Design a protein with these regions (language model features):
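Alpha-helical transmembrane segments
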Residues: 1, 49-54, 134-136
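N-terminal signal-anchor module of multipass membrane proteins
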Residues: 1-40
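Membrane-interfacial helical/loop segments at transmembrane boundaries in membrane proteins
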Residues: 1-2, 73-77, 224
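Membrane helical hairpin/interfacial module
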Residues: 27-95, 102
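Long, contiguous internal "core" modules enriched in hydrophobic/ aromatic residues
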Residues: 17, 26, 42, 94, ...
């Protein structure tokens, strides 16, 4: 069996650069947006989440070394049915690929492209269909947080609270996007009227997560020394 890990090695976390911030924002917005969409189910919101999911997948894929080998890796992995699920990058690409492909399918139903007719519209509005995207979105958001915890030697990143913080951040971003789209008349105002009230509680929970995150990160002498080196 071919060792595929040598074909597209993951770049070290400390060399990811500024694009990692865009990846985290896009995936947080798309992932938790699909969680919120379980109750909202607005097609324009789905379009935005689809774009964010695809952009996040493209950015995380760009952090693979020797990117030109990726088509060969996909081919051999599918042929031999050999997937390295011990790799965070592999798990992430699978999750984000499912989210991206699924969201494109969702968007095509909403836009009436190829998948036309009332049966497809009923599918897009069904609880089970949206529950699948909700779970997949939350898992993708949690993954993006766990990916950061794998960084070695980067202050404040290797904390177990990072995934929790990312869920709170994703919820905040998705609710803010809904409020913005509501103000622009892109979504039904009545369906998102609860956003203003919910955003207060989400922001409060996010602040609590941030303070807990900093407290845990600075709770040891090693953590404090590491932060002092970064200042």
């Amino acid at each position: 069996m071919i060792d595929l890990s040598t074909l597209t090695p993951q770049l070290q976390a400390t060399h990811w650069g500024w694009t990692i911030a865009l990846f985290l924002w896009f995936i947080g917005l798309s992932g938790m947006g699909f969680f919120i969409n379980y109750w909202v189910r607005q097609k324009n919101f789905v379009y935005v989440l689809t774009f964010c999911g695809i952009a996040g997948l493209a950015l995380v894929t760009s952090h693979l070394g020797r990117l030109s080998n990726l088509p060969f890796v996909i081919f051999y992995a599918l042929r031999d049915f050999s997937f390295n699920f011990q790799s965070w990058m592999m798990i992430g690409i699978v999750l984000l690929s499912l989210l991206s492909v699924g969201s494109v399918f969702y968007s095509m139903i909403c836009a009436g492209i190829i998948f036309k007719g009332s049966k497809w519209q009923k599918l897009a509005q069904s609880n089970g269909f949206n529950a699948v995207f909700s779970v997949l979105g939350v898992c993708s958001t949690i993954y993006s947080g766990f990916l950061l915890t794998q960084a070695v030697g980067v202050s404040l990143w290797n904390s177990s609270l990072i995934p929790v913080l990312w869920i709170m951040s994703g919820l905040t971003s998705s609710i803010a996007m809904l409020e913005l789209m509501s103000a622009m008349g892109l979504v039904d105002h009545k369906s998102v009227g609860w956003c203003s009230r919910t955003s207060v509680w989400v922001d409060t929970a996010k602040l609590f997560a941030i303070f807990s995150f900093v407290y845990v990160a600075l709770g040891s002498e090693i953590g404090r020394a590491s932060c002092r080196e970064r200042v």
